[in-house]
Structures are given as C-alpha cells and as structure tokens.
Amino acid sequence: MDRNKEIFEESKKYMPGGVNSPVRSFGSVGINPPVIKSGKGAMIKDENGNEYIDFVLAWGPMILGHCDEDVVKAIKKTSEESIAFGASTKLELDLAKLLCETLDNVDMIRMVNSGTEATMSAVKLARGYTKKDKIIKFAGCYHGHFDGFLIEAGSGVLTEGIPGCLGVPEESIKNTLIGIYNDEKQVEELFEKYGNDIAGIIIEPVAGNMGVVKCDPKFMRKLRELCDKYGALLIFDEVMCGFRVAYKGAQTLFDVKPDLVTYAKIMGGGLPCGAYGGRREIMENLSPLGGVYQAGTMSGNPIVMSAGLATVKKLYENPSYYDHIEKIGSKLEKGVLEIAKKKGLGLVVNRQGGMMTLFFTDLKEVKCYDDVKTCDGERFKRYFLHMLNKGFNIPPSQFEAMFLSVKHTEEHIDKFLEAFESFEG
C-alpha cells in the first residue's frame, strides 16, 4: 500500500491542491509528494517508511536538526504551564532581550507570527516613520504573500510559474517599485525618478527565494548611500538568512547598517514565529507608543518563545556550529562542482554558509533574477527525481535553497556526492 499517495489524494478533498503551501505539492516536478511522518537530526521518514537525508529542513528553520533535545525539552516544560494567554510573559522578554543584546543594529524588537507578518509590518513602519509611500523590492526576492510584494516575486510564485497573483488589485502594488538585484545604475535611476516618495528598500541580503544569489558588497553600500541621500530606510529581510549564514546573519557580510531587520524561520525553533527590529527612534513609532498600528493575538506565544529562546541561545553559545556548517558546506560545493566539470555539466553553485543552490546553466555566474530564469528547469527536474530516489530530500524547485544543519555530517555529504556522481544529466 502506498500510504504517501493515499494520504495525499485524500488531502486534495479537503485542502486546495492537497497542501497548505503550494511548493509542497511537487507540481513542478510532476510527482506526488512524500508525506512526512517523523524526523530526527538530519533524517526524515515518510508514511511509507522511506528515510531521507534532509536538505530542506522545513525550508530553513531546523538548523539544529529535527527534534533537537533542548528545544523539545523547552516546549514540553512551557506547555505544562501555559499554551496561550494573549498577555505579557517573561519568556517574550527573555527572547527579546537576548536578541537585542546579541544582534547588531537591533535596539528594540516586536514579535509576530510569521515572516510575512514581519516584512509587511516593517514596510508599514518604514512608511509611517518617513511619511512616504513607495517601497523598492527586487525582482526574484520574496518577502511573503503580502499583496504589495507579489510582483516579480521568488519562492513559490516563481516555482509555480505564476506571473503575478490574481486577487491583487493594481492599487495594492502601485507603490511597489522593482529593482534589479546587483544593478547599481538601475536602482539609482529609480531614486532619481521617485526619490522624494521612497520610504525604503527591502532586500534579502542573501537572496534565497530565487535560489541563493549573493549580494555584491559594493551594491549594498550603494543602497545605503541612496537611502541616506533621499531619507529612505534600508530594510534587511533576514527571514531566511538570519541566524543561518552567521549568528548575526547577513549583516556580518557587509560594512552596512540596516535601519530595520526582519527575522523568522530559525528564530522560532521550528514553530510559527517572526520578528522585526531596528533603531529605537524608528521602533518607538509603533503602537502603543506611536501611530503605526500592528497587533496579533498569538504574537509572543509562550510555547513559541520557549522554542525560539532554546534555539537562539544554543546558537549563540556554540559558535563552532557555524564552523562545522561552513566546513561541510564547502566540501559539498567543491564536490558537486568537480563532478559537474568531469561530466561536462553546465553548473553554477551559489552558497553562503549553510544555504546553497545548484543552478543548471552555462552562465559563468548567477547574480540576478534574469540569470535565474535562464536556468535549465528540465535538467533540474531530472536531478531532483534522481536524488529523491537515492534517498535525499532536496527542494523540488530550481528556485529554492538547500540547507545544512549542525546534524549533517561529512558522511552525509559523501553520500550526496556519490549520488550526484551517478546523475547522468
């Protein structure tokens, strides 16, 4: 009996497409998805009993591996005392204090329930603070399913081949300007034309939602310069790369200070969580201190805060975790490039720490959305199916990142490279 198929087919009766997030349907690779039952460390198991070495890690959050003992212990302890109050708790103070005291450029922070909430709230705050309306986002960058961001977005929008999104009125996107990632001149032209109306720039400082694309430090400095010149705010969307490329996130890669930063994924320890923070003078514009209103019944939920606190504290106290991830990440990157060269496969590997994408292309580098769109989707599909059959859970999309955890070992990397070597292209 194929339990995966049975469960997925029944799910289609009750959930649109059988899923609660489109990329999980595996529509772009043409097969039914495995239905996951359990996970431990770097391994997951589906309903048919098949085991996989997991390079998706819940799309990034599980940097400590699945069911980390300390995170599970924290969740159990808190759940015996509280589930939800809709009131202040010491746990939310403990996490907020840890984040503000150990991260750069975060004087104050506000907890929310998802990355989407964090980014949409940060943009609202930027508009309220500057008294301006327009926001620059970059083609291929995904900042959640907020109406104003669903234009030339990455992630599932790109995976599913959706040109935009039905249900988003023109009115909702009229103040969204599209920049080209790593193109200084084009962004400068946007400011020359709209500068007095631009509230801010929101950017993934390491893009992960069009696949991993690194930001040129020179480009990032130009963004800071333009924001300072025109009185706009620079917002780092570190929902994916925060606590992943380094404990302090992508800010460590640039000699640039953002005005606001958004977090999610890792900071929730695998539970629904998000946050946005920044300079005190900006954050104090939030209600109840200021006129920018944002609220949430489940924001700062005690169980989520306990999972986040256990995760963030463990990462902060163990910098060697990042050394390990860099070591195995470097081995994986070098290994696949050597194999591809030997086989004559056109391949670009973009990696930053524990996030990485294999782009099947004859380009020498992949540095923006237009480059990503030229990559060979059919070859990626063959590669994905090959690796899945070999026991590897990787993203079912050319336009997503693979992730590494502290539980991945050199043996896991060796097995991946062995499987990749048998891929015929």
UniProtKB/Swiss-Prot annotation:
<dbReference type="InterPro" id="IPR004639">
    <property type="entry name" value="4pyrrol_synth_GluAld_NH2Trfase"/>
</dbReference>
<dbReference type="GO" id="GO:0005737">
    <property type="term" value="C:cytoplasm"/>
</dbReference>
<dbReference type="GO" id="GO:0006782">
    <property type="term" value="P:protoporphyrinogen IX biosynthetic process"/>
</dbReference>
<keyword id="KW-0627">Porphyrin biosynthesis</keyword>
<dbReference type="Pfam" id="PF00202">
    <property type="entry name" value="Aminotran_3"/>
</dbReference>
<dbReference type="GO" id="GO:0008483">
    <property type="term" value="F:transaminase activity"/>
</dbReference>
<dbReference type="GO" id="GO:0030170">
    <property type="term" value="F:pyridoxal phosphate binding"/>
</dbReference>
<keyword id="KW-0413">Isomerase</keyword>
<dbReference type="InterPro" id="IPR049704">
    <property type="entry name" value="Aminotrans_3_PPA_site"/>
</dbReference>
<keyword id="KW-0963">Cytoplasm</keyword>
<dbReference type="GO" id="GO:0042286">
    <property type="term" value="F:glutamate-1-semialdehyde 2,1-aminomutase activity"/>
</dbReference>
<protein>
    <recommendedName>
        <fullName>Glutamate-1-semialdehyde 2,1-aminomutase</fullName>
        <ecNumber>5.4.3.8</ecNumber>
    </recommendedName>
</protein>
<comment type="subunit">
    <text>Homodimer.</text>
</comment>
<feature type="modified residue" description="N6-(pyridoxal phosphate)lysine">
    <location>
        <position position="265"/>
    </location>
</feature>
<comment type="similarity">
    <text>Belongs to the class-III pyridoxal-phosphate-dependent aminotransferase family. HemL subfamily.</text>
</comment>
<comment type="pathway">
    <text>Porphyrin-containing compound metabolism; protoporphyrin-IX biosynthesis; 5-aminolevulinate from L-glutamyl-tRNA(Glu): step 2/2.</text>
</comment>
<dbReference type="InterPro" id="IPR015424">
    <property type="entry name" value="PyrdxlP-dep_Trfase"/>
</dbReference>
<dbReference type="InterPro" id="IPR015422">
    <property type="entry name" value="PyrdxlP-dep_Trfase_small"/>
</dbReference>
<dbReference type="InterPro" id="IPR015421">
    <property type="entry name" value="PyrdxlP-dep_Trfase_major"/>
</dbReference>
<keyword id="KW-0663">Pyridoxal phosphate</keyword>
<dbReference type="InterPro" id="IPR005814">
    <property type="entry name" value="Aminotrans_3"/>
</dbReference>
